[in-house]
């Protein structure tokens, strides 16, 4: 997957299927201090409440965030709560830990991210949840990434994870719609 780089951050970034890599000034704007950041924006066929729950409950995270069946997650969705991901990728187990920085139920979650044995420098993930009619919108910004190598791995991770999140949410939505249609049929037949 090609990485798209930008000198500065576009204020409204487009909705698309792929995360974008940005390389821009860190905090104070000193050109010598640069930081890598990944932005992703996606619309899902689910409510904002369902999307938020997919990010903040252990069974949901294990279902969509892991690379395969041996991946595990521990999620404590409150400020100061810890999280741990063990993502199995072939023979490699990626261990990611962090803590929840801020949570606004149904709207926003921010957490630190440390990818052990790869780069022990912590980065930050901010996820905003919005409603667009009967769908929900997710805006993810993973910033303060220490290296291009880590950014490349994270680009692949977030692209695959957001695809899996969509597959995780679609069957739930499909079942909800199917049961609503069945209920209408039953009530109209009576």
Give a label for each model feature.
Residues 3, 112-167:
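Beta-strand/loop substructures that line and gate deep hydrophobic ligand-binding cavities in soluble
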Residues 32-34, 75, 90-94, 117-121, ...:
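A generic structural micro-feature
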């Amino acid at each position: 997957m090609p990485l798209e780089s930008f000198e500065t951050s576009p204020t409204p970034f487009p909705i698309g299927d792929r995360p974008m890599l940005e390389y821009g000034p860190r905090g104070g704007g000193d050109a010598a201090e640069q930081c890598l950041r990944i932005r992703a924006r996606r619309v899902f066929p689910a409510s904002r409440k369902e999307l938020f729950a997919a990010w903040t409950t252990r069974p949901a995270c294990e279902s969509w965030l892991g690379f395969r069946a041996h991946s595990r997650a521990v999620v404590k969705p409150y400020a100061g709560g810890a999280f741990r991901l063990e993502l199995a990728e072939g023979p490699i187990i990626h261990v990611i830990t962090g803590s929840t920085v801020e949570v606004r139920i149904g709207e926003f979650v921010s957490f630190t991210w440390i990818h052990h044995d790869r780069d022990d420098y912590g980065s930050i993930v901010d996820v905003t949840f919005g409603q667009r009619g009967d769908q929900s919108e997710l805006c993810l910004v993973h910033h303060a990434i220490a290296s291009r190598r880590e950014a490349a791995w994270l680009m692949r991770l977030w692209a695959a994870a957001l695809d899996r999140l969509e597959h995780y949410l679609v069957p739930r939505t499909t079942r909800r719609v199917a049961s609503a249609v069945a209920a209408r049929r039953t009530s109209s037949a009576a």
